[in-house]
Every structure is written in structure tokens, then in C-alpha cells.
């Protein structure tokens, strides 16, 4: 798949994964249109990081969409009455940081935007190996959403579908960090923490997964 001179809408949250996708697209000489969401999340600092990444890569356009999912909550990221789990990553359990329907909503908005500007791809930083168990970050979800997207708009019906591009889907977080460096992503400017503090808490799932991967990458790098 070549991205050179193609238009791509990237869901840019400001985190490690979406910033890496942006870096890969930039290095591939794609025309990047960034889309971020102010959805009532407690970690709004990610929006600042998203804007920094957008400027760093000098993308074509960057939009922040206001879409308040805190109106009905259902997640510790959008409901401050719920505590973010800090006891460590648990396997085979979907944590309460899962936001009901978030990726489905975000990708749907991105699909509308992509069709409106005649973009060829939607770039997603979803990752199936080191994720926290979210149902909307898995390969079967991406496959089914692509099938839906092909039916849901004019381009799809005319056999020129907008494709979901998920370059990180089968990578572990250590591999993503390596890819981030090779694509000139300023990792110090990205934001992964869920807790909403001015500095990363180091205890939430997102911090733990990122920090563990960084230590592995650092150790492996020092051995070379």
C-alpha cells in the first residue's frame, strides 16, 4: 500500500500510537488531515499534545471536534465518579477505562470527513497486542467496520472505498516505540496517561504499558 500523494484522515489523539501513525504517513509523503476529539475526557492534556504533533509534522489541517460523551458517562475516562484502575494491567478483562462506542463514533466521523474531502484513507493507531482489552481495538472489529464503511458511503458503492489503515495493529508497544523514533515522532511531546494530572501518573494501564515497553526498548537498544 502506497500513501505517497494520497490524502489521509488520521485520528490523532496526541498519544504514542496515533502520533506514530502520523509520523509514518508524513514520511510516506501523504497529505495528512488530523482529527481529534474533545469528548469530555478527564485527560484533556492529550488535545494539547495532538496539536503539538500536528504542528511538528506540518500537516494539511487539524480539527478538534467537540463531542461530549461525558453526558452519559459509562467510563472512568468520562465520569469522574469512577476511579481509574491503578492496580496493573489485567488480562481477559475489559477495564472501566473503555469508553462505550468511542471508536465507532470517532471512525464514523472520520469517514464522513474523509468522504467530504475525498481522502483515500483513515489512519488509526489501534493496536491488538498491547491494548487494555478494548473490543474496538481488535482485528475483527476493524475488518467488520471496513465492511460497513464500504456500504455506507458513495465512494464505497462506486467501488472506490475509503480504506482503514492500521499499520500498528499487529505490533507490540516496544516495536511501536522503535517505529516512532525511526519516523521522527517527538515522544516527549506525546501524552498517554489517563489520570488527567499535569504529569503522567505512572500507574494507570496506559502509563504501565508505555513505560514497560520503553524500558524494554531501552534495554535492547543498550545491548547493541
From Swiss-Prot:
Gene3D superfamilies: HUPs (3.40.50.620). GO terms for biological process: queuosine biosynthetic process. CDD domains: QueC-like. Pathway: Purine metabolism; 7-cyano-7-deazaguanine biosynthesis. Zn(2+) binds at residues 193, 201, 204, 207. Belongs to the QueC family. HAMAP family: QueC. NCBIfam families: 7-cyano-7-deazaguanine synthase QueC (TIGR00364). This is 7-cyano-7-deazaguanine synthase.
Amino acid at each position: 500500500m502506497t500513501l505517497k500523494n494520497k490524502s489521509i484522515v488520521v485520528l490523532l489523539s496526541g498519544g504514542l500510537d496515533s502520533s506514530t501513525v502520523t509520523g509514518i504517513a508524513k514520511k510516506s509523503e501523504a497529505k495528512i488531515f488530523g482529527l481529534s476529539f474533545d469528548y469530555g475526557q478527564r485527560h484533556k492534556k492529550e488535545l494539547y499534545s495532538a496539536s503539538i504533533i500536528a504542528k511538528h509534522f506540518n500537516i494539511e489541517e487539524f480539527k478538534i471536534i467537540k463531542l461530549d460523551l461525558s453526558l452519559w458517562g459509562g467510563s472512568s475516562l468520562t465520569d469522574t465518579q469512577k476511579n481509574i484502575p491503578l492496580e496493573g494491567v489485567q488480562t481477559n478483562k475489559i477495564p472501566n477505562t473503555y469508553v462505550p462506542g468511542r471508536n465507532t463514533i470517532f471512525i464514523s466521523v472520520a469517514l464522513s470527513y474523509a468522504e467530504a474531502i475525498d481522502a483515500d484513507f483513515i489512519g488509526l493507531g489501534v493496536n491488538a497486542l498491547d491494548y487494555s482489552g478494548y473490543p474496538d481495538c481488535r482485528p475483527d472489529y476493524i475488518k467488520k467496520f471496513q465492511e460497513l464503511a464500504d456500504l455506507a458511503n458513495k465512494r464505497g458503492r462506486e467501488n472506490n472505498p475509503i480504506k482503514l489503515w492500521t499499520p500498528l495493529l499487529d505490533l507490540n508497544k516496544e516495536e511501536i516505540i522503535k517505529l516512532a523514533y525511526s519516523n521522527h515522532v517527538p515522544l516527549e511531546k506525546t501524552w498517554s496517561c489517563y489520570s488527567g494530572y499535569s504529569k503522567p501518573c505512572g500507574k494507570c494501564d496506559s502509563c504501565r504499558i508505555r513505560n514497560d515497553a520503553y524500558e524494554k526498548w531501552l534495554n535492547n537498544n543498550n545491548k547493541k
